[in-house]
Design a protein with these regions (language model features):
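Intrinsically disordered, low-complexity Ser/Thr- and acidic-rich flexible linkers and loops
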Residues: 70-85, 127-135, 294-295, 321-322, ...
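Beta-strand-dense domains in secreted/periplasmic systems and polymorphic toxin scaffolds
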Residues: 8, 23, 33, 41-45, ...
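Single conserved hydrophobic/aromatic residue that forms the stacking wall/gate
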Residues: 1-14
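A residue-level detector for well-ordered beta-strand positions
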Residues: 13, 22, 33, 54, ...
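Short, small/polar residue-rich loop motifs at catalytic or cofactor-binding pockets
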Residues: 27-29, 48-50, 85-86, 106-108, ...
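Short, ordered secondary-structure scaffold segments
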Residues: 18-20, 34-35, 97, 162-165, ...
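Surface-exposed extracellular loop regions of Gram-negative outer-membrane beta-barrel proteins
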Residues: 34, 321-339, 394-434
Length: 491
């Protein structure tokens, strides 16, 4: 073994592999690793890690992973001899090396088959689609000349996906549950526009400057442009301004003269957000909101951290010289939140098992304690409360939670072949959701019995929602634009 001290960490290395064998952090917590003669990691454990055991085949492919719950005992020693873990296993085709199955600790899992070109052809899940036990399956079809994926189909009611490409193998059209989406490119093969026909008929045009950098976008809906953004950059290539709908007063970004990190953000309404950071770790220590002429900060947040960079204190100021709310955070050796002591509202406290499932929690002064029971898939099967009704979550064979509890009570949830929540049911109340090819929710409809109460549709820029439409009256009129959203490109 060899050892070295780096900063406030000590690292002991395995002599035969030179890989870390035990790392002790600044607070004395240990992360230990074991290796086999071929240098493959076979276990990790210690006071700073959740214990795990790994096994491999002769081709160095991972064939099993064992994790441990064992509530009431903190496993810090080498777990390789333990037999009380939960195992996930992988199977492979001997000839190709392709993964053919993944099996979870309950015996359920997924299986995969491939075509003659070793491309995924069919994925079979644990759920079934009929009384004969036919597995829920997804089939993938490819262009015989280019090899591009052209369709994804399912043997249940989940809508299919269809793709079209140009001669450069760039995606030009997608047909999904939202309708048809057409993509266009400029002479540099950069995305130029995205036009959607269907549930939310709209056009999104992407803008670029002379250097090819994104300089904003414009959203067309109905008769014209409903949102337009413009981004500019400084001489160092950093975002300098963001304007909305050709406004005269943009958002302005300022950067630290030494480290180059974001320091200020000026709002069009004269408000300024100011960031202060630690000198060496660049961790945020303060976020100030400044308004000209104000005696106090409209809002301010102070942060403190421990030696591992974990937040230990957060002070929130609300237009007052003294903090209105203070959070004091503490952690266990595995960096899981153990307590949040608030200056008002009491303390939130949590305990965990060896894989990170909650075992107990108490949230706030006067709150009753809750105890959690987890199964071998790390799914909660029971939440028992000292006061009030307990709750027993349920899951389907693919691990999706089918019984949930919200502030509005308990709901039954069903999922499609892509494991997207498609329907929520509570008595005669029903919520139905639809998704596009990027797994973005594009419609949410709420029913009371057979009566439609509301229907909303959503438009996205990437994964960010930028518009909300009211589609409750789509039988007689096109959806009405209700909201648009502007997002900070740096966040």
């Amino acid at each position: 073994m060899t050892s070295s001290l780096v900063g406030s960490e000590m690292c002991i290395r395995d002599r035969s592999t030179a890989s870390p064998s035990c790392v002790t952090d600044a607070l004395g917590n240990t992360a230990c690793y074991a290796y086999d003669p071929r240098g493959r990691k076979t276990a990790e454990y210690g006071t700073a890690l959740q214990p795990s055991v790994f096994a491999y085949d002769d081709a160095d492919r991972l064939v099993s992973l064992m994790t441990f719950r064992v509530p009431g005992e903190t496993i810090a020693a080498d777990p390789q001899e333990r037999t009380d873990g939960d195992m996930t296993a992988w199977s492979y085709d001997d000839a190709s090396g392709l993964m053919t199955a993944k099996t979870y600790a309950d015996g359920h899992g997924e299986s995969y088959s491939y075509d003659d070109w070793n491309r995924l052809a069919v994925k079979r899940q644990a759920r079934t689609v009929d009384g004969q036990g036919t597995p829920l399956a997804t089939s993938y079809t490819y262009d015989p000349q280019t090899g591009n994926l052209v369709s994804v189909m399912h043997n249940d009611a989940t809508p299919s996906l269809n793709y079209v490409y140009n001669h450069l193998n760039l995606l030009t059209q997608v047909a999904d549950d939202s309708g048809t989406r057409t993509l266009a490119y400029n002479q540099y093969n950069e995305a130029e526009s995205e036009t959607t026909a269907g549930l939310a008929a709209s056009a999104l045009n992407y803008l670029r400057d002379g250097l090819g950098r994104s300089s904003g976008y414009s959203l067309h809906y109905g008769e014209g442009i409903v949102q337009q953004t413009a981004w500019e950059y400084d001489g160092c290539g950093r975002l300098s301004t963001v304007s909305l709908n050709n406004g005269d007063d943009p958002f302005v970004y300022g950067y630290h003269a030494v480290n180059g990190l974001l320091e200020t953000l000026d709002y069009p309404n004269t408000l300024r957000r100011w960031y202060t950071r630690e000198e060496k770790r660049d961790l945020l220590t303060r976020i100030d909101y400044l308004r000209p002429g104000s005696a106090n900060y409209p809002a301010k947040t102070d942060y403190a951290y421990d030696a591992l960079g974990r937040p230990t204190e957060k002070k929130d100021y609300f237009n007052t010289p003294a903090p209105g709310l203070t959070h004091s955070y503490s952690y266990n050796g595995r960096s899981e939140l153990a307590a949040d002591a608030m200056s008002r509202g009491g303390t939130y406290s949590y305990a965990y098992d060896n894989i990170g499932n909650r075992v107990t929690s108490r949230e706030g002064s006067g709150a009753s304690a809750e105890a959690y029971t987890a199964n071998n898939l790390n799914q909660y099967t029971a939440i028992t409360r000292e006061e009030g009704a307990s709750f027993a979550p349920a899951h389907d064979a693919d691990g999706n939670q089918t019984k949930i509890q919200t502030s509005m009570g308990e709901w039954e949830v069903s999922y499609n072949a892509l494991n997207q929540a498609a329907r929520f049911i509570q008595g005669n109340r029903r919520v139905e959701c639809r998704y596009d090819y990027l797994n973005r929710r594009i419609e949410k409809a709420v029913y009371e019995g057979d009566i439609l109460m509301s229907k909303k549709r959503f438009i996205y820029h990437g994964y960010l929602q930028i518009a909300e439409l009211d589609a409750a009256a789509t039988e007689s009129a096109m959806p009405v634009l209700r909201k648009t959203y502007l997002w900070d490109p740096l966040e």
